[in-house]
């Protein structure tokens, strides 16, 4: 019987080359951005970020909380999807469902650990950013579980369109602020430059959250993705999947925003491959949005993690820290960069990537709903779309596995759009 993992997996121990260190922006005359991390992040999170051990023990209180919220999550044979795609009897498809968690997505896995770390530091409030609201809801829930206040900067486009998830955050006691806002210098500058119609971006929301965190020593900033510690916390997904999969997949797919979902699902398998312990022929493919195609069209270089260069620079695939993605129903994928470890794997050819157009992703919401009875989040539907696209082309006997990172029951705007375009045959 599968149980909650005792340890996280840290891919840094198995990468073919060392992770490039974070850097300060050139010509910086102010406080070191790297030193700044010690003022805003939970101290234990910083330890997790730089640890080199392959296996890291999950604190008992965190593991207990993960069990309370419903881990381990199920791995499901998608027989209905196989039938609709016309591959039943030829290709087997499995998906790991993070949608069954109470907050509706994988984000709660690291939120619990980070809120616990903030509590250990004696913090009274956690601060973060969110796009579609999945991370904001997870952080708000984790804060409530740990007895902490929460402030969430939500990208303006999602603040208006993802009302239900915003209400759920507020139900957990969080204060939710539309970004860009007038609460910070960063937000005010963006509003002055672009006006009140600015859709916001994750990079901008991060900058606001960090600036707000710095105003009080009782606050800690919780990052939702990109940092290696966050990806490590998410490996509970892939570690469970290793115990659940009845056979080794030929193709493994997950959507990618900053990298935590993709890394969480695939890194335990990629790590096994790097150590020569299996998955030698498996293809690992990231499904990104055409609205933020960093892995397919970005540059591999040092760039800011946020739009205002408040945080350090990381070496990663990036579209540029000032890039403002167009509005998208998959707000959680609207980030300009991706984690350094995933960037290395992409550059070395160990990970492939494909950008999925919004219409194809939205149509895949209905594909999954009508074949499996599950409404995926707009972000997760990118993985569904790519898995479906690939499954049709695979030879007999092939196996596909993908991560369903969250449900779309609160993404009614995306569902409405999907229903409007359902006449377009995408499968």
Swiss-Prot record:
Keywords: Amino-acid biosynthesis, Aromatic amino acid biosynthesis, Lyase, Pyridoxal phosphate, Tryptophan biosynthesis. One of its GO terms (molecular function) is tryptophan synthase activity. Its EC number is 4.2.1.20. Coiled coil: none annotated. The modification N6-(pyridoxal phosphate)lysine is found at residue 107. Its cofactor is pyridoxal 5'-phosphate. Pfam families: PALP (PF00291). Pathway: Amino-acid biosynthesis; L-tryptophan biosynthesis; L-tryptophan from chorismate: step 5/5. InterPro entries: Trp_synth_b-like, Trp_synth_b_CS, Trp_synth_beta/beta-like, TrpB-like_PALP, TrpB-like_PALP_sf. It catalyses: (1S,2R)-1-C-(indol-3-yl)glycerol 3-phosphate + L-serine = D-glyceraldehyde 3-phosphate + L-tryptophan + H2O. GO terms for cellular component: cytoplasm. Belongs to the TrpB family. Tetramer of two alpha and two beta chains. The beta subunit is responsible for the synthesis of L-tryptophan from indole and L-serine. HAMAP family: Trp_synth_beta (MF_00133). This is Tryptophan synthase beta chain 1. It comes from Aeropyrum pernix (strain ATCC 700893 / DSM 11879 / JCM 9820 / NBRC 100138 / K1). The gene is trpB1.
